[in-house]
């Protein structure tokens, strides 16, 4: 939702074939895959983290379509409908089929930091997997096109807030979504995508965790609260 809408806006006035280079931070594999659909190869990109100064005859800079003013993460609530529709129309045909389960638990334990990690991960996992039939998926282990299929195939998705929820773009209408995040976190992008795609979205906000207790994560979700929300939702 960060880079692709800007490219779409730019292409409305400047055909992609006429653009020589894309100047952006180092690309993750899923970003390279998404750009390949638009015929933008890795050789066309310049790593802005490595090359801090560049010179060009013509430079095109695009402001994100959801941004108006203030803190960028708070602005995602203004995500335009056309962005989601364009992403669906462009990328859903490339979904890569694999043996994916309908009940998806987004697993962030492979993350390098403790932001939006469950302190009681094992307790939550045991309940969701053993008693409700969820299956864990680490999105870093999937290709971009497999992520598209995973989300489009799912009936219910549960997880702590993360950039992985951007893939709600590809969900079918009425897919159930349970997102857990700290009460102080203002990013409402998942809710906005759910509104546009007509998803059945539920947010669980957790109390702030003391700084000296965040070494294992900044989310503590009491099991009884999870059980209550799951039973009322499924």
Residue ranges of predicted features:
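The feature primarily captures lumenal catalytic ectodomains
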Residues: 1-234
